[in-house]
Amino acid sequence: MKIIGISDSHGSHWDIKVPDGDILVHAGDFSSQGRLPDTLDFLRWFNTHPHKHKIFIAGNHDWLMEQDPNFWRIIKMEFPNLTYLQDEACEVEGLKFYGSPQSPRFFNWAFNRDRGADIKRYWDKIPTDTDVLI
């Protein structure tokens, strides 16, 4: 099985030459400012790839995903071939993936948490049997 990992495309995803593989993973920062048009453009692009499975998380630039915590429902309805993980797991062909957008505070970006107990409560949820952590 071949897993292709990309991240930090910041709205320039159309310029990326994505290699063939079985699973395509985008590890966040697919937009620069997390606006709805940018997010939808990324989702359309991500959905065009032939990889059997496509998994992604938000990054600290992907504000929409934090500001509208129910936006994932739209993703699931409009893009059923995409898997969005926000502090949750999925299993793909026997591999256990866990995705979390939470990151240590850096200025005032999306999904920033204070170091220590605040961020630890998210990271403590990561299952010990996770094969791929995003």
Where on the chain are the PLM-derived regions?
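Active-site-proximal loop/helix segment associated with metal-binding centers of metalloenzymes
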Residues: 21-23, 56, 68, 80, ...
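Core catalytic region of metal-dependent phosphoesterases/phosphodiesterases
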Residues: 6-92
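Extreme N-terminal starter segment of soluble prokaryotic enzymes
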Residues: 1-3
